[in-house]
Amino acid sequence: MNDICAVTGLFHVLIKTNDLEQTLKFHKGILGLREAPRPDFGQKGAWLACSTPVGEQIIHIWAEGPGMGPTGVTPYGTATIDHVSLMAVGHKAFRERFKKAKLDWREFIIPNTTYWQLFVYDPSGVQMELTFDEGNESGPHGPITPGHQYHPGENFFDRAKYPKL
């Protein structure tokens, strides 16, 4: 028996959605995750994955069932969760992918570190933070795209203007 007690990484995040199709298009088509095998829970949903040191499934999605609450409809936005942070590579390619999909995003450079960040919302209004280590990128960051500076606490999700993916 192991007496060590430690958190070793992110296992998964669960997102509730009213639009499974658009949510899957975002997480698979924009973020590049892949669908993973999911047990039959008797309700719509998905497990999405990428290779991580601690496992495969990192995002679970509910689209119906008791987890959606008493009305069966979930509110949009992150509620008490501010964002989900994922390590990533390919900062410039992700910015281009966001532009091509007509997604609004924000950028941030963490002071006194080698980390850069991109913030973007999924179709359910969950803010996703992609964190990049400069040592894994193909060159320096350069200036932040005008009008895309990240400000903590700023909500830039607009469901009415969210593009069809």
Regions found by a protein language model. Give the residues of each.
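Core segments of cupin and vicinal oxygen chelate
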Residues: 14-59
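Vicinal oxygen chelate
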Residues: 1-4, 9-18, 46-51, 71-165, ...
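Hydrophobic side chains in well-ordered alpha-helices
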Residues: 23-26, 94-98
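Outer-membrane beta-barrel translocator/channel fold
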Residues: 67-69
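Residue-level structural signal for beta-strand termini and adjacent loop
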Residues: 41, 64, 131-133
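Conserved beta-strand in the GNAT
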Residues: 59-62, 129
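Short beta-strand
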Residues: 37-40, 82, 108-110
